[in-house]
Amino acid sequence: MRTPQLALLQVFLLMFPDGVRPQPSSSPSGAVPTSLDLQPGTVGGTLQSSSEATATRPAMPGISTVVPTLVTPSAPGNRTVDLFPVLPICVCDLTPGACDINCCCDRDCYLLHPRTVFSFCLPGSVRSSSWVCVDNSLIFRSNSPFPSRVFMDSNGIRQFCVHVNNSKLNYFQKLQKVNATNFQDLAAEFGGESFTSTFQTQSPPSFYRAGDPILTYFPKWSVISLLRQPAGVGAAGLCAESNPAGFLESKSTTCTRFFKNLASSCTLDSALNAASYYNFTVLKVPRGMTDPQNMEFQVPVTLTSQANAPLLAGNTCQNVVSQVTYEIETNGTFGIQKVSVSLGQTNLTVEPGASLQQHFILHFRAFQQSTAASITSPRSGNPGYIVGKPLLALTGDVSYSMTLLRSQGNGSCSVNRHEVQFGVNAISGCKLRLKKADCSYLQQEIYQTLHGRPRPQHVAIFGNADPAQKGGWTRILNRHCNISAIICTSCCLIPVSLEIQVLWAYVGLLSNPQAHVSGVRFLYQCQSVRDSQQVTEVSLTTIVNFVDITQKPEPPRGQPKMDWKLPFDFFFPFRVAFSRGVSSQKCSVSPVLILCLLLLGVLNLETT
């Protein structure tokens, strides 16, 4: 019977050799400890058999749990197994057919005890384990069924640690099934911010809101885009094509284009071609983008002016677009009902560094508005002017905004002019290039350039003036140059400067004053040139000066209260006499008393 028992003992010893006990990755204090193997029979940590009846002491304060450690698996081909079986997944085995350094689960290393070769084991290369430690001095004898060791912490204190079989550390995470149904939900629940914006699957709104970009559709290419209103950026005012037009935002923008080679850009640049501003349709409402080919959602752009294609004729690029004006009629939540465009064209000389200044106007009005009402200018206040709104002028029965000179990129006078804004002082100038002509023609041309076409005759007193009611407009006073002051008989007197002087004041309640125009005067400054002198270029200047002549009334005062008082010394004679009588007491009789007695005596005589 002894032979089978010895054989079983040998197998048991082979399964649990002395050198394969668990090695901790950290001590209870967090530092790498120095391990000391406990020999059988030593006090304070001997591993006892479960058959022994010796019990351990009760748990003492100060028990700590060491961070789970990893155990070295056995090498393939060697029948001797390690304390724990080999990991099913070796995450650090990155080189097939070769041993990865510090990868304790790499079968290509063929190491029975990798810890004896490697300085440490990479995370994930051994199974996780847990250690529970107490001070070694508290343990006399241990009969724990789990492996135990004594470690030396960083402070030199010996710790008795027991390896606990914590199976939860080696559980596998259950995989979630991902399909087309739950993919988006899982990505939204567990995902974070993305570098790219997520696709918005929500349907477009059913109608435009104020400020929304206006959608356009190009049937030829089946492309949806936005209605653009180029605006000037930078000091040079270069055209920015990406500026979208906002719904119900009536405004005007101006920008400048420079051409390196105008000869090639003349017919190829779409910004110069009139067709690019009306060869598309406008979507009536935003939800039309779901079915843009449906004619119910498309509003064609109607051309209301003559427009020709650009043409390069010799050294001139003809029919280039200089002004674009959109008139858009809307009907509340029913969207855009009608769109019309009028174009202004000019000619450019082909030369190095040629430039073009373009003006873009967008105007919204209510659908089915009468033609007569649509011609009138928008109000600049109701009733009083609002600072920054256009100063309204009148010529005949047509009202419009008063304008100033505007210069192009090369300094020459532009056909597009600045609006005069109420309450805003301004100055502008440009150079007018003229051909040699007689004096009267020069004067007429320069006058029209200074005050604009047509010439303003009246200015609105209030911002809501009606052109049909002449009483709401004040006549413009003109002060021309003094011709008699010129001594030269062969000279031509031409205007070079116009100052627009506007006198205004606040009227009405102090709590809600309204600004109104009291008077306007055009003051011209001139200079003389000889008729024989060939005038080719004249520098012109316009100035706007607003003068506040408000005279604030005195604040109201209450009526004075009646306070009747007698003079301070009204009873002076009687008071003095009475005071003397009192002071004399027994010395003499008061003169007042004597006077009274005399009066009584006289009265008695008359009665008798």
UniProtKB/Swiss-Prot annotation:
| Entry-linked Pfam families | TCTN_DUF1619
Q: What is the predominant subcellular site recorded for this chain?
A: membrane
Q: Which residues lie on this side of the membrane: Cytoplasmic?
A: 608
Its localization reads: Membrane
Which superkingdom is the protein from? Eukaryota
Biological process annotations from GO: apoptotic process; cilium assembly; smoothened signaling pathway
Q: How does it sit in the membrane?
A: Single-pass type I membrane protein
Residues with attached carbohydrate: 78, 179, 347
Q: Where are the transmembrane segments?
A: 587-607
- One GO term of the cellular component aspect? membrane
Q: Where is the composition biased (Polar residues)?
A: 45-54
Q: Which residues lie on this side of the membrane: Extracellular?
A: 23-586
List every stretch annotated Disordered: 23-58
The alphabetized UniProt keywords are: Apoptosis, Cilium biogenesis/degradation, Glycoprotein, Membrane, Signal, Transmembrane, Transmembrane helix
Q: What does this protein do?
A: Part of the tectonic-like complex which is required for tissue-specific ciliogenesis and may regulate ciliary membrane composition. May be involved in apoptosis regulation. Necessary for signal transduction through the sonic hedgehog (Shh) signaling pathway.
What quaternary arrangement does the UniProt entry report?
Answer: Part of the tectonic-like complex (also named B9 complex).
Query: What does the similarity note say?
Result: Belongs to the tectonic family.
Q: Which PANTHER family match?
A: TECTONIC FAMILY MEMBER (PTHR14611), TECTONIC-3 (PTHR14611:SF4)
Question: What protein name applies here?
Answer: Tectonic-3
